[in-house]
Structures are given as structure tokens and as C-alpha cells.
């Protein structure tokens, strides 16, 4: 049985976007599921789109996500070079082989002629297609133009009748009328190959058995097949993945400023959660389970379970999944990751590990942390209206009564520990013979100035310390007295 060999072939044009990362992940999983090789190849034939630093982003993303390649530009391998701009002589050699076979030809048409063809097709409302003008040139005319250094491209010579059929693992057999196939350019006038031609040549020479790409490339597949046939090469297994949508009508796109992998990490998502979520954008394991580490994905992944229908990128679902990963983190690890976010809003020397105990089960993404914690550093200005809670049966009057009762008890409390704070509050509840909320709601409001907080009255009082707790409760009493007109 032939060893499975897949390739991830990104262009160094900027950040690693979600669609690119999904292609990398599926390509990796297909190879590793069958004990095969995962190859990294850099497609930089469009030099105008090259972005400085983009190559480092590709390497870094693959490294931190655990998608370790077996061959590539940085580690070498038996079928290099693995950067297309270093393989231009190879492409030209194979393009000339196609010319010799009558499957490709030189095209010397000027930009002006090409523009007039496009304009004519636009006027007649037909799709643009090259008219094979240069196919009619004699050998002598071609040699004369080459000797005169007239700029040229090399075009594929596609038939104008009949059908080309190709098989895709997701979409099945697809037939295309050959009259719809343009004679696509194989070698550009700058000597660089087009994306399409370089792909076919490299996939063959590198022994690629499975090709994963987006469904937008389905329309190019017949032209790829005709190239494979022209060379007499075996066609790889095609796996065209459905698009990732922003919503029901709009594709997720870097052109629209949608999040890249790097953006998500900077927003506080965990790389493991992002990778897990991306795996499910178009694929499912056939059961209800949704949380998988990379090893589990390798074991379970079957490309035949990829869907045809577009996948919606659901930020709510991603946040939920990230929260599940947060909960599973060891406390020390979560604390280390959260510390930079704590320090954005907390300048005091508090016990951050205690804060992490509260947050780890409540936070979904790390970037939410500052807004959840600012009250630990400084009591925000707040309205006494938040002391009123229908379910807790609290109002301004009984809230003031509670705070005035708890203040002297807190003053006498020693040592100031979580257990003692809890006992002190629960003793007051028993003494007053009221429900917990009558005491705990106003105490928590006075300590935090917020309706919603990570942790309750006991934990907040413990973390901010005795002096700060007393100061805040005294301030709460003062506010409530002012509200009632009792000075």
C-alpha cells in the first residue's frame, strides 16, 4: 500500500487565517491517521503578495498548535526545495515538455489584445476565455519571437469539445464541458509558474497522495486533471472542504477583517480550544462528543465524514469550548496565563492564586478578565439601586440594617480568613433568622459595587483583606444613609 503523503502549502501573505489553519489541520490528520508524512511547502510564486514576516508566522503557528511537519523548508527532506520560488527551473522544464506533447503552447499576446478580448466578452455577456490565437503560430514564428525576446506566457492547451470528469471524496464525480475550460496560464511572463501549474508539478514530484483544499477550487480541478493526464501521472485523491461562513450569507474572509489564528490567541483563546473548534468546522466524528485533543483527532479523523454544506463560524460556541478548556487547566497554569490580565487592572499586592480559583470555572476567554476584576483594585462608583433585589428580598432599608450589623462583627474578627468570614456571616443569618440573601447580597454589593462578580461575599472579603473590607462596608452604610436621608 502506498504511504499517505499530504502537504500544507500556504502562501506567505500575512496572518494564518481560520480557513488556512483548518486546511493544515485536516491535511495533518489525514497523514497521521494512517502513519503518513505531513509536508510543508511554501507557495510564493505570486511575489507581489509576499509579506515580510509571514513565513515566520506559518512556522510559529504550526509549532504551537502541534502540527509538526516531517519535511519542509526549515528541516529539509528528500524532495526539496520546499519553496516554490526556488523551483522555477523545474516548472519551466515541465511546461516545455507539455509544449513538445502539444498540450501547451507559447502565447505572445500583448496586454492590449488581452484587454480587448475581455472587453468583447463583457459586452457580449460571455465568460472570458482566451481564443487560442497563438496556438496557430508556426514553429518558425515562435522561434523568431523567442529570439527577439518578445514577452510570452505558456498556456495549457485544453480541448473545446467533450467532457472532463474528476472525482472528489466529498462532492463525488463532477463532469465539466470542455468548452468551459480556459487555456489557463502555466508559466507567467516573469518566468514564475502560476499557482495551479506549480501545484500539479510539485504534488507529483513530492509524491502527494491526498490533496486538501477549499471547495472554491472545484472549478479548477478539471484543468488539473488534464495536466495529470497530459503528463501520464496518477491523479491524487481530492478532498475539497466546504467554505467557512461568517453567517448564512457571508464567507469568513481575511479581506473582511475576520479573525486570524493569531487574533484569537491575542484575545485570550487557548490554542488547543481553537484547534479543537476548527476541526469541527465541516467535520464530525459521528457522535455527540465535541472536546478532543490532537491525539484523539488523529485517531478518529476520517475525511469521508467531512460535510458538503458550509460551516458557520460560531463565536458563542468557540467561547463555550474555550471555557471548557479553561476549566480543565491546572490552577497554577491558569494563574500564570491570567496574571498579565490581572495586572492590567490590579496594582495592589493581592493573592492572585485565590482570584484564579474563582475565575478558572467562570471565565471563557482570558480577555474577559479585566472587566470582571477591576473592583478588587478599587471600589467603583455605584448606585444604591443595586442593593434592591426582588428574589433576595433585599431593599435599601434591610440592606442598611445588615451592613450596620455585620460591621462590628467584622471589626472584631481575627484572624481574617475565608472560614472565619463565612462563619461570621452565617452566624448573623442565624441570629436574624433570615434567608442567606438578606445578608449576603448587601455585603457582596458593598464589597464589590457590582451586581455580578466572580465569587461571593466571603471570597471577596478574604481577597481584598480586612481593612479594605471594613472601609467599603462603611462607605456602603454612608451611601445608604444618604439615600434614606438619615445622616
Swiss-Prot record:
Can you name a GO cellular component term? cytosol
Residue interval(s) of motif 'KMSKS' region: 251-255
Q: Per the database entry, which stretches of residues form a coiled coil?
A: none
Q: Which Pfam families match?
A: Anticodon_2, tRNA-synt_1c
Output the Gene3D superfamilies linked to this UniProt entry: 1.10.10.350, HUPs
Q: Where is this motif: 'HIGH' region?
A: 10-20
Protein EC: 6.1.1.17
Q: Does the keyword Acyltransferase apply?
A: no
The question of whether Aminoacyl-tRNA synthetase is a record keyword is answered with yes
Biological processes annotated in GO: glutamyl-tRNA aminoacylation
Highest taxon listed in the record's lineage: Bacteria
Enzyme class comes to: ligase
Principal localization reads cytoplasm
Catalyzed chemical reaction(s): tRNA(Glu) + L-glutamate + ATP = L-glutamyl-tRNA(Glu) + AMP + diphosphate
The protein's GO terms of the molecular function aspect are: ATP binding; glutamate-tRNA ligase activity; tRNA binding; zinc ion binding
Q: What does this protein do?
A: Catalyzes the attachment of glutamate to tRNA(Glu) in a two-step reaction: glutamate is first activated by ATP to form Glu-AMP and then transferred to the acceptor end of tRNA(Glu).
Tell me what this protein is called. Glutamate--tRNA ligase
State the organism of origin. Answer: Clostridium kluyveri (strain ATCC 8527 / DSM 555 / NBRC 12016 / NCIMB 10680 / K1)
Amino acid at each position: 500500500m502506498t504511504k499517505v503523503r499530504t502537504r500544507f502549502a500556504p502562501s506567505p501573505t500575512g496572518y494564518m487565517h481560520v480557513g488556512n489553519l483548518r486546511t493544515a489541520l485536516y491535511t495533518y490528520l489525514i497523514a497521521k491517521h494512517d502513519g503518513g508524512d505531513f509536508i510543508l511547502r511554501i507557495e510564493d510564486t505570486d511575489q507581489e503578495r509576499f509579506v515580510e514576516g509571514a513565513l515566520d508566522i506559518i512556522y510559529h503557528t504550526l509549532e504551537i498548535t502541534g502540527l509538526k511537519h516531517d519535511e519542509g523548508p526549515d528541516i529539509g527532506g528528500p524532495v526539496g526545495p520546499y519553496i516554490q520560488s526556488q523551483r522555477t527551473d523545474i516548472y519551466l522544464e515541465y511546461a516545455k515538455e507539455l509544449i513538445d506533447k502539444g498540450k501547451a503552447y507559447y502565447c505572445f499576446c500583448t496586454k492590449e489584445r488581452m484587454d480587448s478580448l475581455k472587453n468583447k466578452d463583457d459586452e457580449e455577456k460571455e465568460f472570458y476565455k482566451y481564443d487560442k490565437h497563438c496556438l496557430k503560430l508556426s514553429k518558425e514564428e515562435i522561434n523568431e519571437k523567442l529570439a527577439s525576446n518578445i514577452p510570452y506566457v505558456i498556456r495549457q492547451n485544453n480541448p473545446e469539445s467533450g467532457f472532463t470528469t474528476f472525482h472528489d471524496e466529498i462532492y463525488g464525480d463532477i463532469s465539466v464541458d470542455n468548452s468551459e475550460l480556459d487555456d489557463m496560464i502555466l508559466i507567467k511572463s516573469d518566468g514564475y509558474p502560476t499557482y495551479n501549474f506549480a501545484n500539479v508539478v510539485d504534488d507529483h514530484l513530492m509524491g502527494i497522495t491526498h490533496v486538501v483544499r477549499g471547495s472554491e477550487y472545484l472549478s479548477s480541478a478539471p484543468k488539473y486533471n488534464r495536466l495529470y493526464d497530459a503528463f501520464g501521472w496518477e491523479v491524487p485523491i481530492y478532498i475539497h472542504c466546504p467554505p467557512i461562513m461568517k453567517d448564512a450569507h457571508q464567507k469568513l474572509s481575511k479581506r473582511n477583517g475576520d479573525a486570524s489564528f493569531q487574533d484569537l490567541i491575542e484575545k485570550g483563546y487557548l490554542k488547543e480550544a481553537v484547534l479543537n473548534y476548527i476541526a469541527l468546522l465541516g467535520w464530525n466524528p459521528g457522535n455527540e462528543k465535541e472536546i478532543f485533543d490532537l491525539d484523539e483527532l488523529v485517531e478518529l479523523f476520517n475525511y469521508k465524514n467531512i460535510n458538503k454544506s458550509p460551516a458557520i463560524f460560531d463565536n458563542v460556541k468557540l467561547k463555550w469550548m474555550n471555557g471548557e478548556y479553561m476549566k480543565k487547566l491546572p490552577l497554577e497554569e491558569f494563574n500564570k496565563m491570567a496574571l498579565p490580565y490581572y495586572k492590567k487592572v490590579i496594582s495592589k499586592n493581592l493573592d492572585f492564586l485565590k482570584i484564579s480559583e474563582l475565575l478558572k470555572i467562570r471565565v471563557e476567554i482570558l480577555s474577559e478578565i479585566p472587566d470582571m476584576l477591576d473592583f478588587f483594585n478599587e471600589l467603583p462608583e455605584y448606585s444604591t439601586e443595586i442593593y434592591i433585589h426582588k428574589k433576595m428580598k433585599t431593599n435599601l432599608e434591610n440592606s442598611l440594617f445588615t451592613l450596620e450589623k455585620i460591621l462590628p462583627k467584622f471589626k472584631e474578627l481575627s484572624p481574617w480568613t475565608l472560614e472565619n468570614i463565612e462563619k461570621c456571616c452565617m452566624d448573623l443569618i442565624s441570629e436574624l433568622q433570615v434567608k442567606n440573601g438578606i445578608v449576603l447580597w448587601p455585603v457582596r454589593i458593598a464589597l464589590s459595587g457590582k451586581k455580578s462578580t466572580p465569587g461571593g461575599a466571603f471570597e471577596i472579603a478574604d481577597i481584598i483583606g480586612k481593612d479594605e473590607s471594613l472601609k467599603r462596608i462603611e462607605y456602603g452604610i454612608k451611601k445608604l444613609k444618604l439615600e434614606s436621608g438619615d445622616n
